[in-house]
């Protein structure tokens, strides 16, 4: 699958919130850079950490916690 398709699938998992997607990808990419193992079958030496993070989100391997939505 192309990166654009993976990004679109990951975005849908986060209810089309680009800001949340950017935060989750950045945090997970940082974890991967610091030695965390990928939760999907991708080689860390071949793929960028951000691409691995997108794949993980798209395949429901990563869930977003810690955001609380309030009603106005």
Swiss-Prot record:
GO terms for biological process: DNA-templated transcription. Gene3D superfamilies: 3.90.940.10. Its EC number is 2.7.7.6. Keywords: DNA-directed RNA polymerase, Nucleotidyltransferase, Transcription, Transferase. It comes from the Bacteria. It catalyses: RNA(n) + a ribonucleoside 5'-triphosphate = RNA(n+1) + diphosphate. GO terms for molecular function: DNA binding; DNA-directed RNA polymerase activity. One of its GO terms (cellular component) is DNA-directed RNA polymerase complex. It is an enzyme of class 2 (transferase). InterPro entries: DNA-dir_RNA_pol_omega, Pol_omega/Rpo6/RPB6, RPB6/omega-like_sf. Pfam families: RNA_pol_Rpb6. Belongs to the RNA polymerase subunit omega family. The RNAP catalytic core consists of 2 alpha, 1 beta, 1 beta' and 1 omega subunit. When a sigma factor is associated with the core the holoenzyme is formed, which can initiate transcription. Promotes RNA polymerase assembly. Latches the N- and C-terminal regions of the beta' subunit thereby facilitating its interaction with the beta and alpha subunits. This is DNA-directed RNA polymerase subunit omega. The lineage of its organism: Bacteria, Pseudomonadati, Campylobacterota, Epsilonproteobacteria, Campylobacterales.
């Amino acid at each position: 699958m192309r990166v654009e398709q993976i990004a679109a699938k990951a975005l849908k998992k986060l209810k089309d919130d680009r800001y949340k997607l950017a935060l989750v990808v950045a945090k997970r990419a940082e974890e991967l850079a610091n030695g965390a193992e990928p939760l999907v079958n991708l080689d860390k030496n071949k793929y960028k950490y951000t691409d691995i993070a997108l794949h993980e989100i798209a395949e429901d391997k990563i869930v977003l916690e810690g955001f609380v939505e309030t009603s106005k």
